[in-house]
Amino acid sequence: MSVVDQKQQYNLNKLQKRLRRDVGQAIADFNMIEEGDRIMVCLSGGKDSYTLLSILQNLQKSAPVNFSLVAVNLDQKQPGFPEHILPAYLGELGVEYKIVEENTYGIVKEKIPEGKTTCSLCSRLRRGILYRTATELGATKIALGHHRDDILQTLFLNMFYGGKLKGMPPKLMSDDGKHIVIRPLAYCREKDIERYATAKAFPIIPCNLCGSQPNLQRQVIKDMLREWDKRYPGRIETMFRAVQNVVPSHLSDFNLFDFKSITHGSEVIDGGDLAFDREELPMQPVVDIEDQPNYQSERLDIIEVK
């Protein structure tokens, strides 16, 4: 192996280790996977779901609990959908899988006028089919491929357009109240997933086969966050930490905190008015050490990318 190949392998190993660490931490923090779980991994053919399946398979080998995986793809009969790609890939991978064929594309085209965004109806139909499939397969958890950037984008979408301080939960009960949905990539950065997908040469299937107009608001938010990440290194990390460090007494939601009960003699909560002023905030957000140009790991990572 040449020096260049060795360096590439080393970088890939380090990247995989980082993703394993982030996924493992999210699983532990939110108790996503338990002993005996049967995890239905929703596979769209995009970089996120491929990475999710790959990392979960990798974690299976060393996880402290036993769990099984079944990959599920919904073939919505979109024109040009390459039906052969996923069965060939999953068959070679050796993972249990199921391809569900439902002509939701035809239903959406019939209901939504030409030129209008079809994503909302399409996602509702897809969600119902996946819930039904999870029941048929005896899955105890449904795993989706949303990552940290998706969570932050949703937070800003709700703030800017919905008037809500609401993001995307790493774990939740499904709409029908019968399934637990998990997002093991919740701590993973999209740029890490992109690099991993490229390195693993996943057979990516385009997400715009339906011809629907993209969610323009989400794209605006995505572009904004990417620009911030370039201009202000560490800002994205700091914002995500904020989502995990909420202080209800210093917001204005009276359903979340009982402001009416505060009277003379009440105890000072979370530092009172001085909670913000006392803190010495850094001039620049803290950047992940592994993003530093001259960062060198103190030990070799022997986890091989396979």
Swiss-Prot record:
<dbReference type="InterPro" id="IPR014729">
    <property type="entry name" value="Rossmann-like_a/b/a_fold"/>
</dbReference>
<dbReference type="GO" id="GO:0051539">
    <property type="term" value="F:4 iron, 4 sulfur cluster binding"/>
</dbReference>
<keyword id="KW-0963">Cytoplasm</keyword>
<dbReference type="GO" id="GO:0034227">
    <property type="term" value="P:tRNA thio-modification"/>
</dbReference>
<keyword id="KW-0408">Iron</keyword>
<dbReference type="InterPro" id="IPR012089">
    <property type="entry name" value="tRNA_Cyd_32_2_STrfase"/>
</dbReference>
<dbReference type="GO" id="GO:0016783">
    <property type="term" value="F:sulfurtransferase activity"/>
</dbReference>
<keyword id="KW-0547">Nucleotide-binding</keyword>
<dbReference type="InterPro" id="IPR035107">
    <property type="entry name" value="tRNA_thiolation_TtcA_Ctu1"/>
</dbReference>
<comment type="pathway">
    <text>tRNA modification.</text>
</comment>
<keyword id="KW-0808">Transferase</keyword>
<comment type="function">
    <text>Catalyzes the ATP-dependent 2-thiolation of cytidine in position 32 of tRNA, to form 2-thiocytidine (s(2)C32). The sulfur atoms are provided by the cysteine/cysteine desulfurase (IscS) system.</text>
</comment>
<feature type="short sequence motif" description="PP-loop motif">
    <location>
        <begin position="44"/>
        <end position="49"/>
    </location>
</feature>
<feature type="binding site">
    <location>
        <position position="210"/>
    </location>
    <ligand>
        <name>[4Fe-4S] cluster</name>
    </ligand>
</feature>
<feature type="binding site">
    <location>
        <position position="122"/>
    </location>
    <ligand>
        <name>[4Fe-4S] cluster</name>
    </ligand>
</feature>
<comment type="similarity">
    <text>Belongs to the TtcA family.</text>
</comment>
<keyword id="KW-0067">ATP-binding</keyword>
<feature type="binding site">
    <location>
        <position position="119"/>
    </location>
    <ligand>
        <name>[4Fe-4S] cluster</name>
    </ligand>
</feature>
<dbReference type="GO" id="GO:0005524">
    <property type="term" value="F:ATP binding"/>
</dbReference>
<dbReference type="GO" id="GO:0005737">
    <property type="term" value="C:cytoplasm"/>
</dbReference>
<dbReference type="InterPro" id="IPR011063">
    <property type="entry name" value="TilS/TtcA_N"/>
</dbReference>
<protein>
    <recommendedName>
        <fullName>tRNA-cytidine(32) 2-sulfurtransferase</fullName>
        <ecNumber>2.8.1.-</ecNumber>
    </recommendedName>
</protein>
<dbReference type="GO" id="GO:0000287">
    <property type="term" value="F:magnesium ion binding"/>
</dbReference>
<keyword id="KW-0411">Iron-sulfur</keyword>
<keyword id="KW-0004">4Fe-4S</keyword>
<dbReference type="Pfam" id="PF01171">
    <property type="entry name" value="ATP_bind_3"/>
</dbReference>
<keyword id="KW-0820">tRNA-binding</keyword>
<keyword id="KW-0460">Magnesium</keyword>
<keyword id="KW-0694">RNA-binding</keyword>
<dbReference type="GO" id="GO:0000049">
    <property type="term" value="F:tRNA binding"/>
</dbReference>
<keyword id="KW-0819">tRNA processing</keyword>
<keyword id="KW-0479">Metal-binding</keyword>
<comment type="subunit">
    <text>Homodimer.</text>
</comment>
